[in-house]
Design a protein with these regions (language model features):
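Short, well-structured secondary-structure segments
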Residues: 47-51, 126, 222-225
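Conserved, mostly hydrophobic/aromatic
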Residues: 18, 39, 125, 187, ...
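Glycine/Thr-rich phosphate-binding loops of Rossmann-like dinucleotide-binding domains
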Residues: 57, 135, 233
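Active-site-adjacent C-terminal substructures of enzyme catalytic domains
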Residues: 208-268
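Glycine-rich nucleotide phosphate-binding loop and flanking beta-alpha elements
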Residues: 23, 105, 133, 229-231
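Extended substrate/RNA-proximal surfaces in nucleic-acid metabolism proteins
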Residues: 73-218
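An N-terminally biased module of ancient metal coordination in phosphate/nucleic-acid-related enzymes
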Residues: 1-105, 110-113, 117, 194-203, ...
């Protein structure tokens, strides 16, 4: 049943709903047109560029490389380039110019201000949690195993990292980010990116995850069916997998397949993983 459901996401929608660009500081230098040509090559009918929204004012990027999001000065270039590609390829593929919004606990006002200013220009969007607030500051949960270890040390245990992550997802869902708040939740199990290094049976959190899924269902939101975890040596999992996927299917929560490509070559992984 699960495999049939996943295949339907690809075959009937033929959409990649999670793609980054050269405007992502931690991505490749492949330009937006490279991604478009790859999407056409692999038979997609629709694609969404979802570049990281700039971080809110006065928030210091916790990434050691300070490369979490697009620079605010580049938003107009991103939009203009996307619009040119929409026109150029309008007879071959539908191109959405969207955004991936980082929910950051305590910075809801700043995020809302950014969305109020730029949200009208985006036709697709993802709401994600990449950063969590610890006792000593903020951390990127997906940067490296070394950074992940620092989060464990700050919060006291791996168990508490999972607890904090899912609590932050709930905060993101319930937050008031204005009328342009994205309604698709990104890579729900991103906290498991380094599960090979930090193995953990998160079955105890299934009730909390079910609460998250119930909120998503009640709000009419979607899930980012993100396959990037399969490419990560420390993960080798879908970011919606196992019992979590079972519950999402049972609740009939819409999902949008996403390669989460930071390089054009990963567009093809939509088909390869099947």
């Amino acid at each position: 049943m699960k495999l049939d459901y996943i295949r339907n996401l690809v075959e009937f929608k033929r959409k990649d709903g999670h793609i980054h660009t050269q405007y992502c500081p931690h991505g490749s230098k492949d330009n937006m047109e490279d991604y478009v040509e790859e999407a056409i090559k692999y038979g997609l009918d629709e694609m969404s560029f979802t570049e990281h929204l700039p971080l809110p004012k006065n928030f210091e990027d916790p990434s050691p490389l300070k490369d979490s999001a697009m620079e605010i000065e580049k938003i107009e270039k991103y939009l203009k380039e996307g619009q040119l590609l929409q026109e150029k390829y309008k007879d071959k593929i539908k191109i959405n110019i969207g955004v991936e919004v980082d929910y950051i606990e305590g910075y809801e006002k700043g995020i809302k201000e950014l969305l109020n200013k730029y949200g009208v220009f985006f036709s697709d969007g993802i709401l994600s949690v990449h950063m969590i607030k610890g006792n000593k500051g903020y951390y990127c949960i997906d940067f490296s195993t070394e950074e992940f270890q620092k989060i464990i040390e700050d919060l006291g245990s791996l168990d508490e990292v999972y607890n904090k992550y899912y609590d932050t997802i709930i905060m993101a869902l319930e937050s008031d980010l204005g009328p342009y708040k994205p309604k698709r939740i990104g890579h729900l199990n991103l906290v498991r990116k380094f599960n090979k290094e930090f193995p953990y049976d998160y079955a105890k959190y299934l009730p909390k995850i079910e609460k998250i899924l119930n909120i998503i269902k009640e709000k009419g939101y979607e899930l980012d069916f993100n396959i990037a975890g399969l490419r990560k040596e420390g993960c080798r999992e879908l970011y919606v997998e196992g019992k979590v996927l079972d519950m999402a299917i049972e609740k009939e929560i819409p999902m949008v397949l996403g390669s989460d490509s930071h390089s054009a070559k990963y567009i093809k992984t939509l088909k390869e993983f099947l």
